[in-house]
Amino acid sequence: MEQRVLCAGRSQQIMDSVLIALRDAGYDAEGAVTIDAAVEMAARGAYDALLVGGGITGDDRAELIERVQAIQPHIALAFADGGPHTALTVLRAALGDGPTS
């Protein structure tokens, strides 16, 4: 079964690249480019991890995490602060060995 990943960032272009990479690696990944949209997605379905992009920082990052964890308290957290090329690495670290497919 694919692990479900909720990705949150600011840039749709970067988000699209990250989603392609995660899906190619076997994850069921969905993305949002606003905090409200990410929270709405978390409320609609269970996710194994929340991947937060480097564009969401400071108080916005704290708000996103707080709101998502209020809905899904056991969600794993991963932070792709180094750009899209780090997303897969940090996600695998947060989840363990990665997707099981």
Predicted regions and their residues:
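Conserved phosphotransfer microenvironments
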Residues: 52-67
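Acidic, metal-coordinating helix/loop segments flanking the phosphotransfer/catalytic sites
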Residues: 33-47
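Conserved acidic segment of CheY-like receiver
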Residues: 2-11, 18, 50
